[in-house]
Amino acid sequence: RGLGDVYKRQVMDYVVVEAKGGRLTATIDKSINNLSNADVTVTVPANGSIRALDASSAAKISGDVVLNADKFAMDASSAAKIDVSVKAQSCAVAASSASKINASVEAVSCSVEASSASKITLKGSAAKCTADLSSAAKLSAGDFVAAECSVNTSSAAKAVVNCTERLHADASSGSSIRYSGDCQTSINKSSGGSVGRN
């Protein structure tokens, strides 16, 4: 056994996994404040009961199978990463504080919120999509086809979308929206915001 094996066993002693009210939480014991670069893997079976994912503080969540739900939500913050595939009636995707989400989504409706230099990459499709981006956040959804799409960007945020029917695009404060697809457009630009075809 190498030092790496000993370190992993020691780290596992401080992993706290709790199930409360239908929510599974995996964290490092709050009394420990000197762990750095700890790599802990928690495996959860995808038995059809996963409805939400929440990652923070540089944690990473990845899925090997498509997660099915009527309503699904994912939220990444503080440099966390989420990489999953989802099939749902409605899907909510939120990222903040330099976090990253890479998701394949098949949904009737999809809502996206991103802020503070976070990045969301989507592929798949939805009948309706709404996106709100601010503070240098990025949405890369050129491979995510939405029939109806409403996008609002501000404060140097950037969005790339693919819309086939109706697009409402509102860009302000140095932000930008680029779109593809044969869609009717309603465009508002202010304070250095830009909207254009990709």
Residue ranges and their predicted role:
Residues R23, K30, A59:
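Short, flexible active-site-adjacent loop segments at beta-strand->alpha-helix junctions, enriched
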Residues R1, G22-L24, S36-V40, S191:
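Generic structural motif recognizing short loop/turn segments at the entrances and edges of beta-strands
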Residues M12, V17, A38-V40, T153, ...:
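A broadly tuned "polar low-complexity/structure-edge" signature
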Residues R9, Y14-G21, A26:
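Solvent-exposed adhesion/ligand-recognition segments of exported proteins
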Residues G2-Y7:
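Short, small-residue-biased leader/transition segments that mark boundaries at the very start
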Residues D29-V42, F144:
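An anionic, turn-rich surface loop/hairpin at beta-sheet edges
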